[in-house]
């Protein structure tokens, strides 16, 4: 009986160590405290969309865990778009600017044709290129198929990044982790 008890104890300790190892390996590579913008702190992403010709600006906010707001765009028009990130009522976009060498935005328009130019100034241009906090959208065709959308992804610490178009996305990375992801519907 004594050997059975030791075997059970060995199995229990092994199972506990296995669980601890898996929990630790599922966390980010660095401490959350060391992360300049932990993904758990982002609650809202706002796009300020300025119709360049009409000089009118409207804001569209994606709130984490809620539905996708719809941004009306017109074929043939150009828009200047600014992205802001929020933690509750606190604008944390400056934290992304401060860590511009560690962040990159990908704009994916899978059911539309939109040409994107990054307009970031030196405050949001780092070693990886322009983060994408300020962009110009030249809309060719908003509704290329049903349910057009923009999938916006903020990547933290990519090994490399490219601002070029990659399929339907403007920007691509290798490595890194997703800090935030938002979906905005598009309409004409």
Regions found by a protein language model. Give the residues of each.
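Short beta-strand elements
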Residues: 165-188
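Extended, polar beta-sheet/loop recognition surfaces of beta-rich domains
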Residues: 28, 92-130, 143
